[in-house]
Amino acid sequence: MIGLVGRKVGMTRIFNEDGVSIPVTVIEIEANRVTQVKTLENDGYTAVQVTTGFKKASRVTKPEAGHFVKAGVEAGRGLWEFRTEGEEFTLGQEINVDIFTDVKKVDVTGTSKGKGFQGGVKRWNFRTQDATHGNSLSHRVLGSIGQNQTPGRVFKGKKMAGHLGAERVTVQSLEIVRVDVERKLLLVKGSVPGATNSDVIVKPAVKA
């Protein structure tokens, strides 16, 4: 089963039958329109390419326009591809959120919020050094980052200050709380990566 591309609307909470508050992320999943079907003979693997949303005609390049016209679909805000195993799709076909009706858990992939250049405490959860007791300069610094003349260098992969966020992140096995087909919404328990209105990819959980 393939996944779908949606848009993170934000977080809220709903109450179950026992009155327990459940934190949920609302994902809007408009119809995913098939723009290309890749086959083993032509492409060396099987996959389906989809688009969703809409893009102003003035923002669509000529190659993109030709691609969308060939598929017989309206230009979308991007193109995404899902590998297929035996499923059959046709150009212009619309895939909706109702495919998750019988799914219990999903994996959600998005681009995490960019935090810029951050230190070791925020980036790696390092503990801070003494606030007093003679320490006046090194409250949030890393401390030792190596050994001695041997090896005489800092090992690759050492956790240090640097750029945090703005990377592809997948959160696995999020429970589906509700599928609202009419409003094209998917409610999953917990948080998902990315800012409000960012694109996310929702797939059936691999560990379910």
From Swiss-Prot:
InterPro entries: Ribosomal_uL3 (IPR000597), Ribosomal_uL3_bac/org-type (IPR019927), Ribosomal_uL3_CS (IPR019926), Transl_B-barrel_sf (IPR009000). This is Large ribosomal subunit protein uL3. The gene is rplC. GO terms for biological process: translation. SUPFAM superfamilies: Translation proteins. The modification N5-methylglutamine is found at residue 149. PROSITE patterns: RIBOSOMAL_L3 (PS00474). Belongs to the universal ribosomal protein uL3 family. GO terms for cellular component: cytosolic large ribosomal subunit. The lineage of its organism: Bacteria, Pseudomonadati, Pseudomonadota, Gammaproteobacteria, Pasteurellales.
